[in-house]
Amino acid sequence: MKADGGTMERRYWIGVVSRSHIMIGTEGSFVQLNHGKREPLRRFHAGDGLLIYSPRESYPDGAPLQAFTAAGIIRTGEIYQGDMGDGFMPFRVDVDYLPCHETPIRPLIDELSFIRKKKSWGAAFRFGLLQVPEQDFALITGAMECTFPAGFFKDPPAA
């Protein structure tokens, strides 16, 4: 909550996850970022929008993909650890993923305001999690043909 007692304003995020890893996440309704680190997940709040950008099919040496592969809404923002076996206990948050179509990034680059340097656009994703403006989030999810609940967007995208 804000200091004035109001609710948190919804934020919009892009997480960077290989396609093979996010397929596990969508199946289990969770996301883990930056090799299971806790810190990036602390930025999420219930109701935030989340997009997944997959630079590769699989990590670390999979074929290049460069596509948005999943979209959803952060469920509670509560961080917990999952058990992936062999002692790997990554931190996660639950996500309500929505039906979407995988969408390549390249046709969208010129329209995305968070990508300032269009020729070196990949640099925008180097930290594994970035907050983006609602308009960019809506543009990408529109290209993915995602349907968010009524009232999700403060400024709904034009139909």
Predicted regions and their residues:
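Short, conserved, surface-exposed binding loops centered on an aromatic residue
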Residues: 41-45, 61-66
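Short, charged beta-turn/beta-strand-edge "cap" motif at the junction between a beta-strand
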Residues: 54-60
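Hydrophobic beta-strand signal
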Residues: 51-52, 69
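Beta-strand-rich binding-surface signature
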Residues: 12, 49, 92
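Compositionally biased, charged N-terminal/linker segments
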Residues: 1-46, 144-149, 153-159
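Aromatic- and Lys/Arg-enriched surface recognition patch
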Residues: 64-130, 134-135
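Short, intrinsically disordered low-complexity segments
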Residues: 46-49, 58
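C-terminal terminal-subdomain/extension
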Residues: 119-157
